[in-house]
Swiss-Prot record:
It comes from Bacillus subtilis (strain 168). This is SPbeta prophage-derived uncharacterized protein YorP. InterPro entries: YorP, YorP_sf. It holds the Pfam family YorP. It comes from the Bacteria.
Length: 71
Protein backbone atom coordinates (compact mmCIF):
# COMPACT_ATOMS: atom_id res chain seq x y z
CA UNK A 1 0.00 0.00 0.00
CA UNK A 2 1.49 3.38 -0.96
CA UNK A 3 2.18 6.00 1.67
CA UNK A 4 0.87 9.56 1.33
CA UNK A 5 2.06 12.70 3.09
CA UNK A 6 0.01 15.83 3.83
CA UNK A 7 2.96 18.18 4.27
CA UNK A 8 5.56 19.00 1.57
CA UNK A 9 9.33 18.95 2.06
CA UNK A 10 10.47 22.44 3.07
CA UNK A 11 7.36 23.28 5.10
CA UNK A 12 7.99 25.23 8.30
CA UNK A 13 6.51 23.37 11.29
CA UNK A 14 6.33 23.49 15.06
CA UNK A 15 6.72 20.33 17.10
CA UNK A 16 3.53 20.13 19.13
CA UNK A 17 2.55 18.58 22.47
CA UNK A 18 1.77 15.19 20.89
CA UNK A 19 5.54 14.57 20.77
CA UNK A 20 5.90 14.90 24.55
CA UNK A 21 6.33 11.17 25.17
CA UNK A 22 8.83 10.39 22.40
CA UNK A 23 10.86 13.63 22.35
CA UNK A 24 9.80 15.88 25.25
CA UNK A 25 12.78 18.24 24.85
CA UNK A 26 11.74 19.00 21.23
CA UNK A 27 8.20 20.20 22.07
CA UNK A 28 7.73 23.84 21.09
CA UNK A 29 10.72 23.99 18.76
CA UNK A 30 10.31 25.24 15.21
CA UNK A 31 11.87 23.52 12.24
CA UNK A 32 11.58 22.47 8.63
CA UNK A 33 10.60 19.16 7.04
CA UNK A 34 13.66 17.89 5.18
CA UNK A 35 12.52 14.43 4.08
CA UNK A 36 9.50 12.16 3.71
CA UNK A 37 10.16 8.80 5.40
CA UNK A 38 9.04 5.45 3.97
CA UNK A 39 8.62 3.98 7.45
CA UNK A 40 5.71 2.40 9.28
CA UNK A 41 6.69 4.29 12.44
CA UNK A 42 7.57 7.83 11.33
CA UNK A 43 6.41 10.16 8.53
CA UNK A 44 8.87 13.06 8.41
CA UNK A 45 12.49 13.96 9.15
CA UNK A 46 12.59 17.46 10.66
CA UNK A 47 15.58 19.74 11.15
CA UNK A 48 14.79 22.00 14.11
CA UNK A 49 16.12 25.41 15.09
CA UNK A 50 19.09 23.86 16.95
CA UNK A 51 20.17 21.81 13.94
CA UNK A 52 18.98 18.47 15.35
CA UNK A 53 17.40 16.10 12.83
CA UNK A 54 14.61 14.02 14.37
CA UNK A 55 11.85 11.77 13.04
CA UNK A 56 8.20 12.58 13.74
CA UNK A 57 4.71 11.31 13.00
CA UNK A 58 2.36 13.69 11.20
CA UNK A 59 0.17 14.36 14.26
CA UNK A 60 3.26 15.57 16.18
CA UNK A 61 3.77 18.50 13.79
CA UNK A 62 1.82 21.73 13.33
CA UNK A 63 2.35 23.72 10.10
CA UNK A 64 3.36 27.33 10.71
CA UNK A 65 1.68 30.26 9.03
CA UNK A 66 3.79 31.42 6.14
CA UNK A 67 3.98 28.01 4.54
CA UNK A 68 7.27 27.10 2.95
CA UNK A 69 9.28 29.91 4.55
CA UNK A 70 11.66 28.57 7.20
CA UNK A 71 11.18 30.31 10.53
Amino acid sequence: MPKYWSYPVGLAVEINNNARYGCPHHVGRKGKIIEHLHSATYDYAVSDETGDITYFKEHELTPLKGGLAYV
